[in-house]
C-alpha cells in the first residue's frame, strides 16, 4: 500500500519577540544583543513577532530581514487585528498567528529512567536526556549545554546553559548547587545571565515556572 503525505496538527514551543513600542529598530538591536549572549541556543530558532504595542506603520520586509540577520528564523506575527497590516506582513513572508492560552503539557507517561552523568560537562558539549530527567554529578562549563525533557539536577556549578522541559513540560524544574548560568530555560521560557537577579548568583537554587514566568528560589539544604 502506497503511503501518502499526511497533514496533522501539532504543538511547538516558539520564542516570541514582543515589540514594546514603535521603535522597531531598537527592539531588533536588543534581540541582536540577546542572541550574541547565547548564539548556539538561538541559531536558526523560529521566532514569532508580537506587534500588539506598535501603532505606527511597520516595514515588514525590513523587520523580517532584521530578525534574519540575528540568525533566527521569523515565522509569523501575532497581536495584529488590522487587516491591512496583516496583508503587508503576509506579502513580506510572515504567517499570521492567533494568540491563545496553551494547555499545560503534562509529564509524559512513558518517561524513561533518569540519565546520570558523573563527569564534567565541558565547553562545546551538549547532553540531552530525551523523555527523562537529567542528573549531573559535576560541573557544567561555560559554553556547555544540558537539556532534558524532564527536570535537571546539577550537583555542581552551572556556568553553561540548562534547558529543562524541552518538550514543553512546564512543571519541569532546574536544581543547581551554584548558579552562574549563561542561560536557563523551562518549556521554552528562558532567561539569559543578565536577567538573573544577583541575589541568586553563586547560590543553591531551584528554578521553576510559576504562572508562565520563571521563578528562582534559594535552597537551604
UniProtKB/Swiss-Prot annotation:
It holds the Pfam family MinC_C. Keywords: Cell cycle, Cell division, Septation. GO terms for biological process: cell morphogenesis; division septum assembly; regulation of cell division; regulation of cell septum assembly. Signal peptide: none annotated. Gene3D superfamilies: 2.160.20.70, 3.30.70.260. It comes from the Bacteria. The keyword Cell division applies. InterPro entries: CAP/MinC_C, MinC, MinC_C_sf, MinC_N, Septum_form_inhib_MinC_C. Interacts with MinD and FtsZ. Belongs to the MinC family. Cell division inhibitor that blocks the formation of polar Z ring septums. Rapidly oscillates between the poles of the cell to destabilize FtsZ filaments that have formed before they mature into polar Z rings. Prevents FtsZ polymerization. NCBIfam families: minC (TIGR01222). This is Probable septum site-determining protein MinC. It comes from Aliivibrio fischeri (strain MJ11).
Amino acid at each position: 500500500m502506497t503511503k501518502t503525505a499526511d497533514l496533522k496538527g501539532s504543538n511547538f514551543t516558539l520564542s516570541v519577540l514582543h515589540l514594546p513600542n514603535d521603535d522597531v529598530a531598537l527592539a531588533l538591536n536588543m534581540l541582536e544583543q540577546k542572541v550574541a549572549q547565547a548564539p548556539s541556543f538561538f541559531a536558526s530558532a523560529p521566532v514569532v513577532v508580537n506587534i500588539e504595542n506598535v501603532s505606527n506603520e511597520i516595514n515588514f520586509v525590513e523587520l523580517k530581514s532584521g530578525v534574519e540577520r540575528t540568525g533566527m528564523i521569523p515565522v509569523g506575527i501575532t497581536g495584529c487585528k488590522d487587516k491591512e497590516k496583516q496583508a503587508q506582513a503576509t506579502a513580506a513572508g510572515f504567517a499570521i498567528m492567533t494568540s491563545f492560552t496553551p494547555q499545560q503539557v503534562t509529564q509524559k507517561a512513558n518517561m524513561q529512567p533518569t540519565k546520570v552523568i558523573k563527569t564534567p560537562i565541558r565547553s562545546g558539549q551538549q547532553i540531552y536526556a530525551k523523555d527523562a530527567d537529567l542528573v549531573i554529578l559535576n560541573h557544567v562549563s561555560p559554553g556547555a549545554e544540558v537539556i532534558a525533557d524532564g527536570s535537571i539536577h546539577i550537583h555542581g556549578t552551572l556556568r553553561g546553559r540548562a534547558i529543562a522541559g524541552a518538550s514543553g513540560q512546564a512543571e519541569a524544574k532546574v536544581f543547581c548547587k551554584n548558579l552562574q548560568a549563561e542561560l536557563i530555560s523551562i518549556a521554552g521560557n528562558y532567561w539569559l545571565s543578565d536577567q538573573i537577579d544577583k541575589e541568586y548568583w553563586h547560590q543553591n537554587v531551584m528554578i521553576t515556572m510559576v504562572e508562565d514566568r520563571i521563578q528562582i528560589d534559594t535552597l537551604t539544604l
